[in-house]
Regions:
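Short, small/polar-rich motifs associated with maturation and membrane association
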Residues: 1-276, 288-290, 930
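A generic structural motif
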Residues: 65, 255, 525-527, 694, ...
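Outer-membrane beta-barrel proteins
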Residues: 104-147, 167-172, 215-235, 254-292, ...
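Conserved small-residue
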Residues: 155-212, 305-306, 310-312, 580, ...
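Extracellular/periplasmic, surface-exposed regions of secreted and cell-surface proteins
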Residues: 278-287, 293-297, 329-347, 353-415, ...
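Extracytoplasmic gating/loop element in the C-terminal half of outer-membrane beta-barrel translocons
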Residues: 364, 819-908, 912
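Glycine-rich, aromatic-lined ligand/substrate-binding cores of catalytic
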Residues: 394, 793-825
């Protein structure tokens, strides 16, 4: 495979490099370089538009320019720090979005920042109307770099850095765990010699004198984990061309280690090789073409098992993963023979430990269970042809695009089995020895490589469009786009394809570059609906006014640009129609009841799963938005702001409340209730971008601020609650619901005087006490209330601040992001500790008679804890945070130093990512309990241009 990859890379580089031609001519582009910088072309739906002519709902990031001061490794890395309207999760608070790379639906994680020219965020409904159904919730359009006319330019960039874990979970050691577990048994009335740990056992575990007999297992010890993991990458870019052909090539490779330092896991790694080539060809004065290809080879190697999940569950006193062979009594020939015959002697001196209850464990898995490799391959190809039809009609052009993408992935593994040994310990003359050894399991290494998890995906996209541009009498500027587009995505083991097909029209008119009218429409199609409802019309209209071009501002030297616009749209989408044939009725016998028939035979009933609704139709996005943009003081200050209000109407559910109760039965399970367009959601919000450029002395400063705020409301729901406070209608759509607490029960009298709590178990002092919202003297689900916003689609308020300072060859860059207004529950097993769960440091604040006035945690229990461990404001915390996301210092060698040399540019930089979190809940927000830790990343890099 490695030889194949190298040949492929060399062929691609030679092919693209050969396009470079001596004596390249200068560009004859009518737009000057200075104009491109002040008013660049921006990729919007199926066309490029001058940034000053965009009438709102669109933001753009120049990634190529950004990388000069902020090197990063993910295409969407902290984009909320640069543009308003994107909060890191969604556009304008919607619950989905479409990612396009060079106009084709693709994955954002399969294009690196070094390959990207610009990213356009199309937020408003008017901006995405031409994309049809699948683009109705917003589009992120990523355009890759292309070749330019000029000499061949070779750029090489290399980076290496280290991820350093921010924090690890803190679990109790064996002795403390055993002590508190005994306390939990006492609380439950279950303590006794057969259930409780003895004082002697607790003492022996506490001393640490023999951790093999009395283990005190710490998953986060330096015995198992490295302090950091390395990530290194190298990228080569080659570009150039002449007036006939231009090319761009990107070849990149990165490798990343893992934290583990033992067993098969010490060789864990992932690596990615990518080759991209983009070619533009001027066939003749009337025809242009482009051919783009990209190939990605991704591999990951991992030991068998999930270490981080095991670390959250395996108690510290359960096992000793490795036991020295030297502890076996010297005259125990049988045990020594049994151990020496195993296939898994670790480091020549340890055998795998376990218990009869723990016949496998993650440590033994990492040493002896084998390993797996994940392999992913992607090939992407697209071609475009542009026809200038001026001989037919001046200003008329035609463009067409065709793309085919293939992606495949699979797992290969060596799946071994192993035995563990359970020692029986004795003490002779004060020394611990293993007097007997039990073996459980079978050692087996078949040497067979297994293949599993094979998946394939194919995407085919096509578009064809006519474009028309003309100016009448120097004041009437008209442009239009008529586009037909569609794509299909086929996935293995999925019968129906994901499809999108639409016909779109956009007509733009402006008078004297002052008054703008944009009219857009698309005819969308969906096979997920019944015949007669599969097509829908989506209109959009925008009015704009460039005040700067009015006479009353024409001579205002402080105002460079001032534009106001307003848009209204109704888009139809099938994105929330999850399956095909939801409009059809459905019957089956899966939940049918058995009933007797003749001669003792039984028959199962055929039941209705749902009724039919042939009137099921598209969900509608109805939106009104306004936008203002300005540039002041010779581009010293630029600002853009949008306000939006939209309603997603006709979301599909099965509305039980509008049908008689007998339409559904619980046994046998049956229903005649069909799917229907019923639920409605409303979102209201704004986004702001402000940029300030200023030179102070010899330092050039650039300060950018971005903000996004949105509020949501469930305006219609299928509900029939007994009490108004239970209704979801009128509340935030990402609402978190739960009980309100009144602290802990103080004593038995307090329990008897309070409403009965019906969640299970016997209520005792130290349990959580809840508010009886409806005063029915019972605490149950009817007492759950709205507690706050979950921020499922991004924080309600998102902030971003970026600062650039340039002094001679030095550049300082800093980026901060913040999210405010959301809440979350501490509801993982790290916080909800009960039964035989692993005890975290949180339980130290448990309620006892001695700590009843200061307790921060309910009484301990070995039972389910159903009363305490449920959603309530006791477990609620605010996720408000500000992150120092990036700091980078760069240095560019002066041009004078590089004169007459082969090097045109040399720059070096150091950076740190995810450096600081400012929050009252910092420790909670920075902690991962069942996955790899969050990390700070420290990087050093160099870039050389030939």
């Amino acid at each position: 495979m490695k030889k194949t990859n190298i040949r492929f890379i060399l062929c691609m580089m030679i092919a693209f490099s050969s396009l470079q031609t001596i004596g390249a001519k200068k560009s004859s582009d009518s737009i000057t370089d200075s104009l491109k910088k002040t008013d660049p072309l921006v990729q919007v739906a199926y066309r490029n538009v001058l940034q000053s002519n965009i009438m709102g709902g669109v933001s753009v990031v120049d990634v190529e320019d950004l990388l000069k001061k902020n090197y990063n490794t993910y295409s969407m890395d902290n984009m909320q720090g640069y543009v308003g309207g994107w909060n890191g999760n969604s556009l304008w608070g919607m619950d989905d979005y479409l990612v396009l790379i060079d106009g084709v639906p693709r994955d954002a994680n399969n294009v690196l920042p070094t390959e990207i020219d610009k990213i356009t965020f199309l937020k408003s409904a008017s901006a995405v109307v031409l994309y049809g159904s699948r683009g109705a919730k917003g589009v992120i359009s990523i355009t890759t770099k292309r070749g330019r006319i000029g000499d061949r330019v070779v750029s090489v960039r290399a980076n290496t850095g280290y991820n350093v874990a921010k924090s690890y979970p803190k679990y109790l050691g064996s002795a403390e765990y055993m002590t508190l577990y005994n306390e939990a048994l006492t609380n439950d009335g279950l303590a006794g010699p057969s259930t409780s740990y003895s004082d002697e056992a607790i003492y022996n575990h506490s001393t640490g004198l023999n951790p093999y007999r009395y283990p005190d297992l710490n998953f986060y010890s330096s015995d198992y984990l490295r302090k950091s993991l390395n990530r290194s990458d190298v990228t080569a870019e080659i570009s150039g061309g002449n007036d006939r052909a231009q090319f761009y090539t990107n070849v990149s490779y990165y490798n990343q280690e893992d934290y583990f330092k033992f067993g098969q896991a010490k060789d864990n790694n992932l690596n990615r090789l990518n080759v991209r080539g983009n070619i533009d060809i001027n066939v003749n004065p009337f025809i242009k073409a482009s051919v783009d290809a990209n190939a990605t080879f991704y591999n990951a190697r991992n030991a068998k098992g999930d270490y981080w999940a095991a670390a959250s569950t395996l108690r510290p006193n359960r096992i000793s993963p490795l036991v020295p062979i030297s502890f076996i009594e010297s005259n125990d020939i049988n045990s020594l023979t049994m151990v020496n015959n195993t296939l898994n002697i670790i480091d020549g001196k340890y055998f795998l430990g376990g218990t009869q209850q723990d016949l496998t464990n993650i440590f033994a898995d990492y040493y002896a269970a084998g390993y797996s490799k994940y392999t992913s391959r992607q090939f992407q190809f697209d071609t475009k042809i542009d026809f200038d039809l001026r001989k037919v009609l001046q200003g008329l052009t035609f463009n067409t695009m065709f793309a085919v993408d293939y992606a495949t992935s699979y797992n290969t593994s060596f799946d071994n089995t192993y035995s563990v040994f359970v020692p029986s310990w004795s003490n002779y003359n004060g020394a611990d020895v293993i007097s007997q050894l039990g073996k459980f399991g079978v050692d087996k290494k078949s040497g067979v490589q297994n293949i599993s998890g094979s998946t394939d995906r194919q995407t085919i996209a096509f578009s064809g469009q006519f474009n028309y541009n003309t100016t009448i009498n120097d004041v009437h500027n008209i442009s239009a786009v008529l586009v037909g587009a569609g794509y299909q995505r086929t996935e293995s083991e999925v019968y129906h394809r994901i499809t999108n097909a639409n016909l779109g029209l956009m007509v733009n008119y402006n008078y004297a570059n002052k008054y703008f009218v944009d009219l857009g429409a698309s005819e969308v199609h969906s096979a997920r609906l019944a015949e007669g409802n599969r097509n829908a019309f989506s209109p959009s209209a925008t009015l704009g006014w460039k005040l700067k071009n009015e006479n009353f501002l024409a001579n205002a030297s402080d105002v460079d640009e001032l534009t106001l616009s307003a848009s209204g749209s109704i888009l139809n989408t099938d994105m929330d129609i999850s399956n095909y044939y939801m409009y059809e009725s459905n019957y089956n016998q899966a939940g049918g009841a058995w009933w007797g028939w003749y001669d003792g035979a039984s028959e199962r009933s055929t039941n209705s799963v749902r009724g039919a609704n042939k009137d099921l139709t598209f969900i509608k996005r109805k939106e009104f938005s306004v936008n203002a943009s300005t540039s002041l003081f010779k581009n010293t200050v630029s600002a853009n702001a949008s306000f939006f209000i939209n309603s997603m109407e006709g979301l599909i559910i099965r509305p039980a409340t509008i049908y008689p109760s007998y339409f559904s039965t619980y046994y046998p399970e049956a229903s005649f209730i069909p799917y229907a367009n019923f639920n409605n959601n409303k979102r209201t919000g704004f986004d702001v971008n402000v940029n300030l450029k200023k030179r102070i002395g010899a330092v050039d400063f650039n300060l950018g601020v971005a903000a996004t705020y949105y509020s949501s409301e469930a305006t219609k729901r299928d509900e029939n609650y007994q009490y108004d406070y239970q209704n979801r209608t009128g509340k935030q759509i990402d609402g978190v619901w739960g009980l309100q607490t009144l602290g802990f029960f103080a004593d038995a009298q307090d329990v008897s005087n309070s409403p009965a709590q019906k969640f299970g178990g016997i209520i005792k002092p130290g349990d959580l006490k809840y508010v009886d919202q409806n005063n029915d003297n019972v605490i149950d689900e009817k007492d759950e209330v709205y507690l706050g916003r979950g921020g499922w689609y991004g924080a309600p308020l998102t902030l971003g601040v970026n600062l650039t300072a340039k002094y001679k060859g030095f550049t300082f860059f800093a980026l901060g992001t913040g999210g405010y207004g959301a809440v979350a529950m501490k509801n993982s097993t790290y916080y909800w500790v009960y039964g035989n769960g692993k005890y975290s440091e949180n339980v130290r604040g448990r309620w006892t008679e001695a700590t009843k006035e200061t307790a921060t945690y309910p009484r301990l229990t070995t039972l389910t804890g159903a009363n305490n461990f449920r959603n309530s404001d006791f477990w609620l915390y605010k996720t408000d945070r500000f992150n120092l996301a990036k700091v980078q210092i760069s240095y560019d060698l002066p041009k004078s130093v590089l004169e007459n040399g082969i090097l045109k540019e040399v720059s070096a930089y150091i950076s740190g990512s995810n450096l600081l979190t400012v929050s009252k809940q910092r420790e909670v927000l920075e902690l991962n309990t069942t996955s790899a830790p969050q990390a700070r990343f420290y990087n050093v890099g160099v870039k050389v241009v030939f």
